[in-house]
């Protein structure tokens, strides 16, 4: 059997979580016998030194527009797959490329097509999200049945894909969450928690319309008379129209602290000094703060959706609320403060106990490179 040539397409990943996904995937490709890896990226500047066994090909212009992106996926990639003699092709960013290879895979992580009840206000504040919702369902569909396997992060998305696209070769590939080395309180944390009796509630999220910051502001307003409860939110109001709107909703609230963007060390500090991680988001592929809160043993108050229940699984220090009901959230916070919040032993993953699941990028890369 000849050497396999695996092409990893990630031209759209440049920053944040998606770029982290690319780096974790590349790290998992090391020491694979009879396999060479080629990565198609926006820029290889930050990657070459860390992953010397990978050949990088740069496409800096592709991210410039959707037309360039689609031309790349459906025209350039076909030509490239022939020139590289690729045997395997994995698209890490949702679109199934038009290629000529023995094996073809796509990693689908954008849940926008499945967002329900988008409001006109949300469309005005983040029109790009509305376009994603409308177009991504169609983009997912193109070539999807030509894949050897389709990877998603959760079973709820697998069920959506089965229903919408009539395919059965969907593999759940979950991220492996590991705590950073800094997991203990430091002196720097004192700037946030001067009063040990204070109840601190943390919500780390970028300002997107589906993140549902409004619910936290509404709950904070109803709790404003209780001086020993405060909320830490990771927006500043300067990021976009939605962030500015949230700041305006919180006018006059002393119990809400807008911290802006935080680096990983400061995020860790906020987790450490928080009593509750609140997660009112209406849409996620996974919900990283849920996993990070679990790893730290924090109480989690989360919106009641399949993705939150699946991510939290059998974790007992959890409680759920309707994402449109601030009174439910307020009650949970008060119950916690009084010591009346009961642990939840339910496990949404129990029904999937007999399903095959890939955990972490090592297992994902092994699945791709092994014969099936």
From Swiss-Prot:
Species annotation: Escherichia coli (strain K12)
Keyword terms: Cell inner membrane, Cell membrane, Lipopolysaccharide biosynthesis, Membrane, Transferase
CC annotations in GO: plasma membrane
PANTHER family linked: GLYCOSYLTRANSFERASE WBBK-RELATED (PTHR46401:SF2)
Organism classification: Bacteria, Pseudomonadati, Pseudomonadota, Gammaproteobacteria, Enterobacterales
Listed pathway(s): Bacterial outer membrane biogenesis; lipopolysaccharide biosynthesis
Gene that this polypeptide is encoded by: wbbK
Superkingdom per UniProt: Bacteria
Function comment: May be a glycosyltransferase involved in the transfer of UDP-GalF and UDP-glucose.
UniProt xrefs under Pfam families: Glycos_transf_1
Principal subcellular localization: membrane
GO annotation terms (biological process): lipopolysaccharide biosynthetic process
Protein's recorded name: Putative glycosyltransferase WbbK
Gene Ontology MF: a single term: glycosyltransferase activity
Membrane-topology annotation of the record: Peripheral membrane protein
Plastid recorded as keyword: no
InterPro entries documented for this protein: Glyco_trans_1
Location in or out of the cell: Cell inner membrane
Membrane keyword on record: yes
